[in-house]
Amino acid sequence: MSIATVAQAKDVRGLNLVAAHSHITGLGLEPNSLTPKENAQGMVGQVKARRAAAVVLQMIKDGKIAGRSVLLAGPPSTGKTAIAMGISQSLGSDVPFTSLAGSEIYSLELSKTEALNQAFRKSIGVRIKETTDIIEGEVVEIQIDRSLSGGHKQGKLTIKTTDMETIYDLGHKMIDSLSNEKVTAGDVISIDKASGRITKLGRSFARARDYDALGADTKFVQCPEGELQQRKEVIHTVSLHEIDVINSRSQGFLALFSGDTGEIRPEVREQINTKVAEWKEEGKAEIVPGVLFIDEVHMLDMECFSFINRALEDDMAPIVIMATNRGQSTTRGTDYKSPHGLPVDLLDRVIIIPTSPYSPDEVKQILQIRANEEEVELSPEALEILTSIGADTSLRYGSNLISVSHMLAQKRKASSVGLEDVKRAYSLFLDTARSVQFLSSSNNYVGEDGTAKLGEREKDAMDTSA
């Protein structure tokens, strides 16, 4: 079984959206330590929870933990998802990280266990080592001979290093590949002899001229040294799910691009597990346990929890991080209550990291970070009242008022958000407590029995003068 992966970097400058946790770049730890800073990498407060998450993160990096589960438990707006995102950012791109919401597994196309199985296998990476022969050097000249009758194109490629220079004959496929990569004289390229794939490494420093019109993405590199033909060890990191899809006869590798993978037969997975085990014994591959993050885990039912119990005991199991904001809650699919809405046998297998509500000072720091992320300038008075609102209502509500207040400030041609903008936004948009108060004083809404008292005027108007 041969597996080839092609890494491509694309410029996505046009997509500049600010998400709820886009300001988080890590767990905010001290260098070469597991001690979290008070305010770093977008993380504020929750020192004990971040310290515990740092221990889990270090064990994941060392590869000493697999098949374990961690539960982040705490009230709403206490940074549970933020801690999981911080772990994801700290791991880097080489360790698989799959994020899943508890309600995502309910689908008409996939069974619950199949959706969970795919999520588990997406979170397990296989680092495959492959030795390939490559030709690496600076292009001196490209000659292409085109037939007048429209036949096959032929050509010659002159390529050199600092020690030698060689001329290669080109077929029509290699000529097309050079044209697609826009290779010209002076470029440093790498050619895979087995597949014929051409990789453009950059432009030679010898061709760097002040008057050349070059793009911002042009990279200058040194001309390679030594032999033209070299043998290099290439490392590909793919997930078990990607190998499943590629080897599924009903879907094929095209399903990787469409996303419509469908059900994958257990026989295919067993064959792949056997093959990966052989690669591991031969030293060709290495298993990389990743992380599966399940948010709102209390939305799963007993069938899903039973599957997770079995999957955690498998040889190739990722680290499962779960988050919930429930206390004593009914387990879905049953009539009995349990802590955090999870069955007792699963709770026995998890280590629980608690999170606590933020202090007003921490709320203020988080709101300032969010304002900087959204490029909103807040006046000191506006920041103080937003802090008071966030501490009294919820951090999410206070964070949502930032963009609304910024829009109101732009309407009055102000450069920064002022106190009156926040007050205006607060009067226009209700928080949970004021919404409940309004509902309790109103009789015009449709009740549970489907009836409503229409046409009656409210006795007390809602107070929006705050």
Swiss-Prot record:
Chief place where the protein resides: nucleus
- Which SUPFAM superfamilies does the entry mention? P-loop containing nucleoside triphosphate hydrolases
Catalytic activity as recorded in UniProt? ATP + H2O = ADP + phosphate + H(+)
Instruction: Relate the assembly described in the record.
Output: May form heterododecamers with RVB1. Component of the SWR1 chromatin remodeling complex, the INO80 chromatin remodeling complex, and of the R2TP complex.
What does the entry list as the binding residues for ATP?
Answer: G74, P75, P76, S77, T78, G79, K80, T81
Provide the function of this protein. DNA helicase which participates in several chromatin remodeling complexes, including the SWR1 and the INO80 complexes. The SWR1 complex mediates the ATP-dependent exchange of histone H2A for the H2A variant HZT1 leading to transcriptional regulation of selected genes by chromatin remodeling. The INO80 complex remodels chromatin by shifting nucleosomes and is involved in DNA repair. Also involved in pre-rRNA processing.
Please give the InterPro entries that the UniProt record associates with this protein. Answer: AAA+_ATPase, P-loop_NTPase, RuvB-like, RuvB-like_C, RuvBL1/2_DNA/RNA_bd_dom, TIP49_P-loop
Native organism taxonomy: Eukaryota, Fungi, Dikarya, Ascomycota, Saccharomycotina
Drop me one GO molecular function for this one. Answer: ATP binding
Q: Which Pfam families match?
A: TIP49 (PF06068), TIP49_C (PF17856)
* Places the protein is found: Nucleus
Q: Which family does it belong to?
A: Belongs to the RuvB family.
Quote the protein name from its UniProt record.
Answer: RuvB-like helicase 2
Q: Which UniProt keywords apply?
A: Activator, ATP-binding, Chromatin regulator, DNA damage, DNA repair, Helicase, Hydrolase, Nucleotide-binding, Nucleus, rRNA processing, Transcription, Transcription regulation
GO cellular component terms given for this protein: Ino80 complex; NuA4 histone acetyltransferase complex; R2TP complex; Swr1 complex
Give the GO biological process terms. Answer: box C/D snoRNP assembly; chromatin remodeling; DNA repair; regulation of transcription by RNA polymerase II; rRNA processing
Q: Under which EC number(s) is this enzyme classified? A: 3.6.4.12
- Does the entry feature the keyword Aminoacyl-tRNA synthetase, yes or no? no
